[in-house]
Amino acid sequence: MSMSDPIADFLTRIRNANMAHHDSVEAPASKMKKDIAEILKQEGFIRDVEYVEDNKQGIIRVFLKYGQDGERVISGLKRISKPGLRSYVKADAVPKVLNGLGIAIISTSNGVVTDKVARAKKVGGEVVAYIW
């Protein structure tokens, strides 16, 4: 059976592994998923990301991050733009997540970036997800 929303599946795998306090999670790789994982790493939401070649599309392995007492670094993940209802924003309407405590991942003409970068470059695009 084909998957209708691979990005939502990727975010759900991360959310579920995070709730179960798993050390890492694997998902089929794609360019968009790699870009999202790199942003999560840069912003400090995950510990590391690794790409495994399997002579097909590859596998992306995300290593989750927890605090000193085992508290989760990722409090929540939410898919915004879905295949049935795309969500686009103009450069002057880029959203803030929890008043700047979280990030919005936006797919722009300059690639996949955070809301802060999109605001700085004055570009809009498709709002992929919110992470806080």
Swiss-Prot record:
The family classification in the record reads: Belongs to the universal ribosomal protein uS8 family.
* A GO CC term attached to the entry: ribosome
Q: How does it assemble?
A: Part of the 30S ribosomal subunit. Contacts proteins S5 and S12.
Biological role stated in the UniProt entry: One of the primary rRNA binding proteins, it binds directly to 16S rRNA central domain where it helps coordinate assembly of the platform of the 30S subunit.
Q: Which GO terms describe its molecular function?
A: rRNA binding; structural constituent of ribosome
What does the entry give for GO biological process? Answer: translation
* Name assigned to this protein: Small ribosomal subunit protein uS8
Q: Which gene encodes it?
A: rpsH
Among Pfam families, the record links this protein to: Ribosomal_S8 (PF00410)
Q: State the source organism's domain of life.
A: Bacteria
Q: Which UniProt keywords apply?
A: Ribonucleoprotein, Ribosomal protein, RNA-binding, rRNA-binding
Checking PROSITE patterns in the record gives: RIBOSOMAL_S8 (PS00053)
What InterPro entries does the annotation carry?
Answer: Ribosomal_uS8, Ribosomal_uS8_CS, Ribosomal_uS8_sf
